């Protein structure tokens, strides 16, 4: 078993949406509760910055060196690190007050994929039970949002194979990682199938390495697993 070492003790309540920026060699993520805070750390000089956000933000995606896309409970937003300006790009489910956003990521063409779910937090940040699969999987492209999947519990894991032929996704409430065929040019999914099951915890967020192995965090399992897609 591999050894895990603490990199930075930032004392997040619920860290989500970690994203790597190759532009400036930095890691970005959000602590989503009780009030969302954006973190950015440069791995060259280990400078850590924090930014208070006016919205309940759960996922991040790089736009440019100075801008980042942020998925929030009722839309997608843009944040500028220099001006500190936070602005709405597009509304999503702003008429469904009982839902919130969850995980998300961008594909190789820059489309932003993200999921929504029933809000499982009270206003003070305390947890409340889920009792509905009211979430959906969305794709934002050319300032238009398309619904890809519905009736989701907790959408997690947004990763693509190195050759962009596969998309891996999970509904944590279902317990399985899913694999889709992915058409990069069209931004479309097909041939959904169960890909991976594990008896320790449930699938949460994931990333993929250069060899195509998927690293999946296990909610309730206190572990990370590395999965060979073959």
Describe each model-derived feature in a short phrase:
Residues 27-51, 73-76:
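Beta-propeller domains
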Residues 3-9, 46-52, 87-94, 144-150, ...:
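A short beta-strand motif characteristic of beta-propeller blades
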Residues 175-176, 196-230:
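Loop/turn-rich, solvent-exposed surfaces of beta-rich toroidal or solenoidal domains
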Residues 37-39, 75-77, 135-138, 176-178, ...:
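A short loop-to-beta-strand structural motif that recurs across blades of beta-propeller domains
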Residues 130-142:
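Beta-propeller blade signature
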Residues 21-22, 27-33, 69-74, 114-121, ...:
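Conserved beta-strand positions in repeat-built beta-propeller and related beta-rich domains
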Residues 180-187:
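Short loop/turn segments immediately following beta-strands, especially the blade-tip
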Residues 10-24, 54-69, 95-111, 118, ...:
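Beta-rich, blade/repeat-based domains predominating
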